[in-house]
Amino acid sequence: MAITKDDILEAVGAMTVMELNDLVKAFEEKFGVSAAAMAVAAPAAGAAAAAEEKTEFDVVLTAAGDNKVNVIKVVRALTGLGLKEAKDMVDGAPKTVKEGVSKADAEAMLKQLTEAGAKAEIK
């Protein structure tokens, strides 16, 4: 029996955010594509200026450290995830905690994670 589009949509609809994130990454790896929106062609001068000053940063949890419970609490507070999803994120490190945040927010998140005992970085 073949799988229909409706079967796929139902399965995707039942997934958590973390499961959907893993699914997207699996698609990117298997098919060599990117889920990022395609950028409209911009003038070369504007692109060079944008490359010089980065305005959006990603906070990446690289290791949970010894005090995993505190790290899970901080991840939950930063992301709004449920307990299971936050635990899965911490257990599956390295994982991106937040994407596209300002430099000040990224530094604040990094400080909270490191104070909880985690190892994290800003990309």
Swiss-Prot record:
Q: Which SUPFAM superfamilies match?
A: ClpS-like, Ribosomal protein L7/12, oligomerisation (N-terminal) domain
Provide the alphabetized UniProt keywords: Ribonucleoprotein, Ribosomal protein
One Pfam assignment: Ribosomal_L12
Q: Name one GO molecular function term.
A: mRNA binding
Q: List the disulfide bonds.
A: none
Give GO terms for biological process: translation
Identify one Gene Ontology CC term for this UniProt entry.
cytosolic large ribosomal subunit
Q: Which HAMAP family does the record associate with it?
A: Ribosomal_bL12 (MF_00368)
Family classification: Belongs to the bacterial ribosomal protein bL12 family.
Q: How does it assemble?
A: Homodimer. Part of the ribosomal stalk of the 50S ribosomal subunit. Forms a multimeric L10(L12)X complex, where L10 forms an elongated spine to which 2 to 4 L12 dimers bind in a sequential fashion. Binds GTP-bound translation factors.
Q: Which PANTHER family match?
A: 39S RIBOSOMAL PROTEIN L12, LARGE RIBOSOMAL SUBUNIT PROTEIN BL12M
Described by its record, this protein's role is as follows: Forms part of the ribosomal stalk which helps the ribosome interact with GTP-bound translation factors. Is thus essential for accurate translation.
Name the record gives this protein: Large ribosomal subunit protein bL12
The gene is: rplL
